[in-house]
Amino acid sequence: GMGFVVGTLLEEGLAHADILTVWDGGFESYSREPGVDGDGDTLVWRDPGPSGDNDMLRPASAPFQADGGMRLVEGTLGRACFKSSAVERERWTIEAPCRVFDTQRAVNEAFTRGELDRDVIVVVRFQGPRANGMPELHKLTPALGVLQDRGYRVALVTDGRMSGASGKVPAAIHCTPEALGGGPLAKLRDEDVIRICAATGELSTTADLSSREPAEAPPPETGMGRELFAMFRAGADGAEQGASAMLAMAGL
């Protein structure tokens, strides 16, 4: 389907056809798809034609959402990204007590014990650039998806990173400022009520965090070369600035 996607972006003027790529012919050549001719021996490139399934691929002139699939949410817990593209509209707003964890492993252990079988917002903190290098948190979605399928209203809040792994579960990710260094997530406690709303751009808690001390970060994991990158973690910028030590040192 990539040929169709590139083609519709070019048709709507949302991409430049003449940019140079690793392939001959510029970006426009990516709007064609490979195949074989009738005898099955010769590679040919052809126009992909219209979408074969409008539930999966649509032209840019008739998008799934006219205003895109990302939302900025912000409030007393900081600023975060909410990927709304695969989340049902009735789940754009979640308000529930939270459970606070410092690792993916702890979340899945609590899920296995049945401790998350309720309406809950799972907070996974100390996953930001300076805490542990902001790894991909791909192990969270299966458990949260199961809880959602059981009828519970669940969501995720984290200063960690996810790409497309959030899927159908409401998730406020890349939260900044991160918990390490005293960000708001470090002051949350179990059962604090959190509200996430992609429609209004809200990420807040009813708890008064002003008088609380931030939780201590867990000791960093060691081995597999992590020690070599400690200096980069210590000097990294926040997620909104690129989460990069090199860019930070260059003042970019």
Where are these regions (language model features)?
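Catalytic or ion-coupling anion/metal-binding cores of large enzyme and transporter domains
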Residues: 1-153, 157-178, 183-252
